[in-house]
Amino acid sequence: MAIPMRPRLLAALAPTFLGFLLLQVAVGAGTPPGKAFNLTWISTDFKTILEWQPKPTNYTYTVQISDRSRNWKYKCTGTTDTECDLTDEIVKDVNWTYEARVLSVPWRNSTHGKETLFGTHGEEPPFTNARKFLPYRDTKIGQPVIQKYEQGGTKLKVTVKDSFTLVRKNGTFLTLRQVFGNDLGYILTYRKDSSTGRKTNTTHTNEFLIDVEKGVSYCFFAQAVIFSRKTNHKSPESITKCTEQWKSVLGETLIIVGAVVFLVTVFIILLTISLCKRRKNRAGQKRKNTPSRLA
């Protein structure tokens, strides 16, 4: 005997409805719908944040990071954010490889409101591991700043500022140079102001001294580089700076012209005074040589 259409439809939809019902019951009981994903380290000059997805519903996140003893340390416990600042942990030793993971911890409704069910019945909450993070190798270098520059004759001198990091020693923040030593260098890319052709110069210090053409303006920018790295070895480009040799040449020209005008003016004044004195002397001599008339 054929089954009527409506009971057949209900029979087909029953598993779907049951699954949906169980999902709602699980969520209501505090079971997290899933684990964190897209775990990403965001780190510049050792300022380090771990980010992930998605935004939690009916559960919270807790981050764990391994210390040098291989023990898990809890950070950002019971947070509903999707990021956690781990800077204070990773700057303790920038040459250590850190492991981190994000745990999804469900809520539980109680007489005290919502509470987190952490490690219920001895079971560990679902978690997702982040990739291993070695600060010395993985932190990005921030945009450098050109501190000062000077072009004189055929030489251009450029000094790059030695930026501070969040790494501390004896309570004092260390500079990039103090952390990386000779592994840190800078690349200067420069060109004539009126040209598109570029040249580069590399230094292991913070200063450049390059040969240029006299009286020609130059534009340039700097990049930090970590020589031992295969990836993330260059920083973003600094703000481009340009010398203004036309102003320098104009200034020198004005000084020369001004000096010439001053000397000419002084000469004219002295000549005028001298001529006036001569005229007076001649007039006086004339009066002496002219015989006086008798009354």
Curated annotation (Swiss-Prot):
Cross-referenced Gene3D superfamilies: Immunoglobulins
Any one Gene Ontology molecular-function term assigned to this protein's record: protease binding
PROSITE patterns xrefs: TISSUE_FACTOR (PS00621)
Single GO BP term: cellular response to low-density lipoprotein particle stimulus
TM ranges: 253-275
Residue span of motif WKS motif: 246-248
Membrane topology value: Single-pass type I membrane protein
The family this protein is said to belong to: Belongs to the tissue factor family.
Assembly, per entry: Interacts with HSPE; the interaction, inhibited by heparin, promotes the generation of activated factor X and activates coagulation in the presence of activated factor VII.
Name of the molecule in the record: Tissue factor
Taxonomic path: Eukaryota, Metazoa, Chordata, Craniata, Vertebrata
